[in-house]
Amino acid sequence: MIGRIAGTLIEKNPPHLLVDCHGVGYEIDVPMSTFYNLPAVGQPVTLLTQLIVREDAHLLYGFGSAAERNTFRELIKITGIGARMALAVLSGMSVPELAQAITLQEAGRLTRIPGIGKKTAERLLLELKGKLGAELGHAPGTPAVPDSAVDVLNALLALGYSEKEAAAAIKQVPAGTGVSEGIKLALKALSKA
């Protein structure tokens, strides 16, 4: 297993890279989120990797963060989601955005990704529910699902509301609202529905 590559970036052609590591050039496919953060050609680069072995090829996928790689690994476990589709998902939205879409059960956000239809989006929501942990949903420097929103969601579920109802109510709560105030506002939104 090749878990990490450190070398010189020789070639960039989205989504493909060529990284020279002590005279050996590794072809690596990366999500666009990683691609946009790469250094210039000729500069050193370090990527976390995932090797996929198929009958006809050995494919190497690279990631700029452990959260991206972990999410990729979770995605390829899902029936009907191969490495290319997983790469498309990670290119279409950041890990925190994906975690938020999963937490709030927003299939519509997933269907905006090329190649993801309604059924695939619903399968992603079902299979990834509870699997994108705090380290994935709260990558430093990126917007994520606030802890308070997750707590409000859990409180509404504990009160017997469906996930769909709870997610819709949470959308009515302004970002940055505390848990107790968030629950009050969500319950108010639910009473009007």
Curated annotation (Swiss-Prot):
Gene encoding the protein: ruvA
Domain remarks in the Swiss-Prot or TrEMBL record: Has three domains with a flexible linker between the domains II and III and assumes an 'L' shape. Domain III is highly mobile and contacts RuvB.
GO cellular component: cytoplasm; Holliday junction helicase complex; Holliday junction resolvase complex
InterPro entries in the cross-refs: DNA_helicase_Holl-junc_RuvA_I (IPR013849), Hlx-hairpin-Hlx_DNA-bd_motif (IPR003583), NA-bd_OB-fold (IPR012340), RuvA (IPR000085), RuvA_2-like (IPR010994), RuvA_C (IPR011114), RuvA_C_sf (IPR036267)
Region entry Domain II, spans: 65-143
Record-given protein name: Holliday junction branch migration complex subunit RuvA
ATP-binding is among the record's keywords: no
Entry's family note: Belongs to the RuvA family.
Species of provenance: Cupriavidus taiwanensis (strain DSM 17343 / BCRC 17206 / CCUG 44338 / CIP 107171 / LMG 19424 / R1)
